[in-house]
A protein has these predicted regions:
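Flexible, low-complexity linker/hinge segments
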Residues: 1-3, 135-163
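Conserved AMP-binding/adenylate-forming core of the ANL superfamily
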Residues: 18-63, 67-71, 88-93
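Conserved AMP-binding A3 loop
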Residues: 30-32, 164-204
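Structural core segment of the AMP-binding/adenylate-forming
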Residues: 47-48, 75-146
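Conserved pre-ATP/AMP-binding loop-to-beta segment of ANL
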Residues: 150-168, 174-175, 213-223
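Conserved AMP-binding/adenylation subdomain of ANL enzymes
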Residues: 187-227, 231-276, 289, 293-294
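Gly/Ser/Thr-rich phosphate-binding loop
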Residues: 246-248, 272-277, 287-353, 363-365
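Conserved beta-loop-beta connector loops within the AMP-binding
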Residues: 365-378
Length: 378
């Protein structure tokens, strides 16, 4: 596929410039401004000496700036590096060194840790700080807002679809490792996921521009609320990439803790169509909040919700049934890892859910401990 993330989003920004691209709390960024701000930050990265294949870390909480910074890295032909905001100094040094990062975006609340590690990372050319209401403790940084004011937007360029997209593992099976994909091939995987969810995706993805015009005419864009961190594959791939690749909206909250009532209120306020979570850890408190609201005589308005998507942790049959009792929607349970998606199951009121039962994706095989290839279900 001769496509890459930044070029797709540039095309979309030209078609629906006034539509919402990013929402975080009460801050709304249009597609026009998403492209413009990303282009200005891309200029800042180039001015710092970054270029094609340069790596840049995203040491950020969920925010519009996370997605703007990532797009800026894509625009220069670079490689964004997801950084776990829970890491301590030693882990941060390892990850940023292992990834060959040349720049780091970080929220001001992490500035003391940046100050602690900066001397151990001589290859970092730019530390870009994003204000979050906390006091900065690191002086040698570029300020995100000042860059938006001072930088001209970078001119659009042709990019290689074989440019790497990389996501680092969480480190649960050893030190974090970067899993690499060619952007063009990874986009094929993402569009297949959208097709499996029932979205009208053209057979030839290079005809995507025509499809975006159709979405515009019918006003059928996805609006996805991302309940989990963007630093992990579930939040980024299923929560942000899927809606943005079809000209939709990525909705986040700056709150670090999970508040189910705040989430359902945000669903009502933004008219969310999709919700992305991580199994029962999210779904159970979400169900409890719905039950409480119903018992109080003030149920949440779920009429806009079409699908809840989960990956990463078990999503039990009992909790799925409870959610379906409140609203008729699709529940999509996906099985995968940083290395790729392997299977999924879809539940509705007409197709009752089961716990941990999946249909494997095309191209997936099952291998026994002795190397023998097994038939699914055998």
């Amino acid at each position: 596929m001769n496509l890459d993330f930044a070029s797709v989003w540039e095309m979309i920004s030209d078609i629906v410039p006034e539509n919402d691209a990013l929402i975080c709390g009460d801050e709304i960024i249009s597609w026009k401004d998403y492209d413009l701000q990303s282009s200005k930050i891309a200029t800042a990265l180039k001015n710092a000496g970054l270029g094609p294949n340069s790596k840049a870390g995203l040491y950020l909480n969920n925010s519009n700036e996370y997605l703007i910074g990532q797009n800026a890295i894509f625009k220069i032909g670079g490689v964004p590096i997801n950084v776990n905001y829970r890491y301590v100094a030693e882990e941060l040094i390892y990850l940023l060194d292992n990834s060959d990062s040349e720049a780091v975006f970080y929220h001001a609340c992490y500035s003391s840790r940046i100050k602690e590690i900066s001397g151990s990372l001589p290859n970092i050319k730019a530390w870009i700080e994003i204000a979050d209401g906390t006091k900065s403790e690191f002086e040698d940084s570029l300020k995100f807002e000042e860059l938006l004011d001072s930088c001209d937007p970078m001119e659009r360029i042709h990019r290689d679809p074989n440019t790497i997209y990389m996501l680092y593992t969480g480190g649960t099976t050893g030190m974090p490792k970067g899993v690499m994909y060619k952007q063009g091939e990874f986009l094929v995987f993402l569009f297949r996921t959208l097709k499996a969810m029932g979205y009208d995706v053209p057979e030839d993805i290079n005809n995507l521009e025509e499809q975006i015009h159709n979405f515009k005419k019918d006003n059928t864009f996805i609006k996805s609320l991302i309940g989990c961190p963007l630093m992990h594959g579930t939040g980024m791939w299923l929560g942000a990439f899927l809606p943005l690749l079809l000209g939709g909206t990525a909705v986040t909250s700056r709150n670090l803790g999970f508040d189910p009532d705040q989430m359902w209120t945000q669903v009502e306020d933004t008219r969310t169509t999709n919700i992305v979570i991580v199994g029962d850890a999210f779904a159970k408190p979400m169900l409890d909040a719905l039950d409480r609201a119903e018992e109080s005589g003030k149920p949440y308005d779920l009429s806009s919700v079409k699908v809840i998507i989960s990956s990463g942790v078990m999503w039990s049959e009992e909790i799925k049934n409870g959610l379906l009792r409140h609203h008729d929607m699709m529940l999509m349970d996906t099985m995968g890892s940083t290395e790729g998606g392997m299977g999924s199951s879809v539940s509705t009121r007409d197709n009752p859910p089961k716990t941990a039962k999946f249909s494997i994706n095309p191209g997936v095989i099952i291998i026994a401990d002795d190397g023998e290839i097994l038939e699914p279900g055998s």
